[in-house]
Design a protein with these regions (language model features):
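N-terminal leader/targeting helix
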Residues: 27-55
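Acidic-histidine catalytic/liganding microenvironments
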Residues: 25, 70, 107
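Charged, amphipathic alpha-helical segments
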Residues: 11-16, 57-60, 108-110
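A short mixed-secondary-structure module that forms the rim of ligand-binding clefts
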Residues: 46-82
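General beta-strand recognition
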Residues: 29, 52-54, 74, 86, ...
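Charged, gly/pro-rich active-site loop segments
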Residues: 1-10, 84-147
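Extreme N-terminal tail/first-helix region
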Residues: 1-28
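A short, Trp-centered hydrophobic/proline-enriched beta-strand micro-motif
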Residues: 20-34, 73-77
C-alpha cells in the first residue's frame, strides 16, 4: 500500500482551513480531567466566534465538577475528510447576561429542553483558546493557528 498523497498546506491559509473544518465538523469532542483520569465526550456548541467556542451544559453532568476543579480543556474537531482542529484553552462560566440572552434566543433546542434562561441547571461555558492547531488528513503534522 502506498503512502497517501497530502497536498502541501500554505501557512497563510491555515486559519481559514481551520475555521472551515470547525464549520464542517460541527460536533467536537471535549476533553476534561476527572482527577488523574481524562474524560472525553461529544458536545454541541451553541455559539462559535472564530476559535472561541460556547458550550451549553447541565449542572448535574460530570463535566461540571471536572471543569470546576480544572478548567483546562481541549476541543477536537474532525471533519468527514479527517482534517482536525484542536483548540486548547480554558473553560469559563459565561455570566454576560446580554450574550446569554442572545445565545438563548438563537437556540430553540435550549428553549425546548430548559424552558427558561434562568433555569438553574443551565451553564454556558466559553472556551477561550490559548492554542489552536490544524492538521490536514494524513499529513501527520499540526500547523499552529495564529491567535
Amino acid at each position: 500500500m502506498s503512502k497517501p498523497h497530502v497536498p502541501p498546506v500554505d501557512p497563510a491559509e491555515v486559519p481559514a482551513l481551520a475555521l472551515a473544518t470547525i464549520k464542517a465538523a460541527k460536533f467536537p469532542m471535549l476533553a476534561t480531567m476527572d482527577g488523574d483520569q481524562p474524560r472525553l465526550r461529544p458536545v454541541s456548541p451553541v455559539r462559535t466566534e472564530g476559535f472561541t467556542i460556547y458550550v451549553a451544559n447541565l449542572r448535574r453532568y460530570g463535566k461540571t465538577a471536572e471543569i470546576a476543579a480544572n478548567p483546562k480543556v481541549e476541543l477536537c474537531y474532525c471533519d468527514a475528510d479527517h482534517h482536525q482542529v484542536r483548540i486548547t484553552g480554558v473553560a469559563e462560566v459565561l455570566t454576560d447576561r446580554p450574550l446569554l440572552e442572545e445565545i438563548w434566543a438563537s437556540n430553540p433546542l435550549l428553549r425546548a429542553y430548559l424552558g427558561s434562561l434562568d433555569n438553574p441547571e443551565l451553564i454556558i461555558y466559553r472556551i477561550v483558546p490559548n492554542q489552536v492547531r490544524y492538521m490536514r488528513e494524513w499529513a501527520l503534522e499540526y500547523f499552529e493557528v495564529p491567535l
